[in-house]
Amino acid sequence: EIHDRLTNLLQEGYTLTIDRSTSCPIHNIVKTKDNLQCENVYNREIKRLGLNIHGNIRFIPTEYKLGSIEQRIELLRGLMDSGGTISKTGNKISYCTNSKRLAEDVKELVYSLGGEARIRVYDRTNKGKDIEYNVWIQIKINPFHLERKRERYNPTFKKDCVKYIESVEFSRKSDAKCLAVDSPCHTYLT
């Protein structure tokens, strides 16, 4: 299902291949025979964004986190389809990674869409494995494209998730006043 979805999104002259020779299939975007003279624009963009990496240094590029609401929803769905889990009852979802930065980026992405997220760390180094970061997510929108996950999603919240930034617009330019409180960090509640 993911393979078909990605294939349909590719520009003309490209196709998606799967190498199943390893325990974890590797997907590659390759040029079709009639497009061999051109540079692979997907590989060029992956390199430009610094995404040609693996393992515990993966991340979400800043420009992706600052995309439109629709782009950020699609990003979350792509991440959740490939690395997300959903409980049998459909009310608990999480994203698992061995990259601390990617876990923090997913948390930030969820917050930007009005959801709640928290990261739990599981140290599996004593078993010869990496540290695992599990991002527990609560969000109103359905974060899945995959049918088996999408149909099971049944969010239940103890409190409403309402924090999100829809847009930022210039209002006016004017003088501002700065307030400070007599404490070492100068913080206060309003």
Where are each of the predicted segments found?
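Internal intein/HINT superfamily modules and their associated LAGLIDADG
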Residues: 1-190
